[in-house]
A protein has these predicted regions:
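Polysaccharide-binding and catalytic clefts of secreted carbohydrate-active enzymes
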Residues: 42, 47-168
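Aromatic-lined substrate-binding rim segments of carbohydrate-active enzymes
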Residues: 1-55, 89-90, 168
Length: 168
């Protein structure tokens, strides 16, 4: 997506054509907002607009090259692009089924910091732990993330993992 809303599927089409020539099937991997923690595959228009697409921050407020998972703008842009890709795949491959699977995201997480400390993340951290998570973990204790899980690195990782999972 070189420009917002302008999709170029030439590479996707080329991969499908090549796979068909060799009687192969494809499993695509959607990196979207993150790849191995970083937002390196996000389009340039996302990378350049840190106001619309804020970055994650370390505990010391150092900005990271990681778009925050707490940004609805990021989620909506990622969702639109993914939906357009899936519509395109359906249009070009619904008969031959060359693509047999789409893996959504891979190795998301944070390096350098266990969790995001951006203003959006801090707001979520001060909120009560979502009831569905407490239920899934069979926890009776209610409260904020710090009250329920403590304040160590493992607690921070639980917080971040939950919100990455919710995003995806």
């Amino acid at each position: 997506e070189p420009n917002e809303g302008k999709y170029d599927f030439a590479l996707v089409d080329s991969v499908i054509t090549t796979a068909r020539k060799h009687d192969l099937k494809i499993v695509f991997l959607w990196f979207g907002a993150w790849k191995n923690s970083m937002s390196c595959y996000a389009p340039l228009w996302v990378k350049e607009n840190t106001k619309r697409f804020p970055r994650s921050l370390t505990e010391n407020s150092k900005p990271l090259e990681i778009c925050t998972a707490f940004s609805d703008n990021l989620l909506q842009a990622d969702k639109r692009a993914f939906c357009e890709l899936m519509k395109h795949i359906k249009a070009v491959d619904s008969q031959e089924n060359t693509i047999i699977m789409m893996q959504v995201e891979n190795e998301i997480g944070m390096l350098e910091s266990a969790r995001d400390h951006s203003p959006l993340a801090e707001k979520a951290y001060r909120q009560p732990v979502p009831a569905p998570l407490l239920k899934a973990l069979k926890l009776k204790k209610k409260g904020t993330w710090a009250e329920v899980f403590g304040t160590d690195r493992y607690a921070d990782e639980k917080f971040q993992a939950y919100y990455y999972a919710k995003y995806v």
